[in-house]
Design a protein with these regions (language model features):
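Conserved core of the PLP fold type I
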Residues: 1-6, 57
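PLP-dependent aminotransferase class I/II
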Residues: 9-85, 90-93
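Short loop segments at secondary-structure junctions
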Residues: 32-36, 104-107, 137
Length: 152
């Protein structure tokens, strides 16, 4: 909130895609000074949010217990990945998000190994690097085993 009071050109945006589990609904919100919000209203598309998405977002926003569990689970799983990367000497960028960006000597080979088991990671953002979206714990266990096997 302090940033919004201090800077008239700041917009803070949040998505419901990740922690709220509403990726297909394409819904989020923005906090910004009134003048910028009024301008955004003039350029947004009409009917940019359908009723189903709005109802789902409102229900998700009301379920703060679910959000807290999701954020906690994500943090625990991210810590497991960071520990494994440290153990294997894999360079990565620390993250508070639901993904980790990391280097691999054979990024394409590793991505293919995961893909053969049904897991996709984001490729091509930087040569030799992959972006791993933090998976559910049971999938994370399988993916970490694949990574260990791949690195040995």
């Amino acid at each position: 909130r302090a940033l919004l009071d201090e800077f008239p050109n700041v917009a803070i945006m949040r998505t419901f895609s990740k922690a709220y589990g509403l990726a297909n609904y394409r819904v989020g919100y923005m906090m910004t000074p009134l003048e910028l919000a009024n301008y955004m209203q003039t350029i947004r598309l009409p009917y940019n949010l359908n009723t189903l998405s709005q109802v789902a977002a409102e229900a998700a926003f009301d379920d703060q217990e679910f959000l807290a569990r999701t954020v906690s689970q994500n943090a625990e799983e991210r810590t497991k990945w960071e520990s494994l990367f440290d153990e294997l000497g894999i360079h990565y960028y620390k993250s508070e998000a639901n993904f980790i960006f990391f280097a691999s000597p054979d990024a394409e080979g590793l991505a293919d190994a995961w893909l053969k088991s049904g897991y996709q990671v984001r490729r091509g953002q930087r040569e030799g690097w992959l972006r791993l979206t933090i998976p559910m714990p049971q999938d994370g266990d399988i993916m970490r085993k694949i990574l260990r096997d791949f690195m040995n």
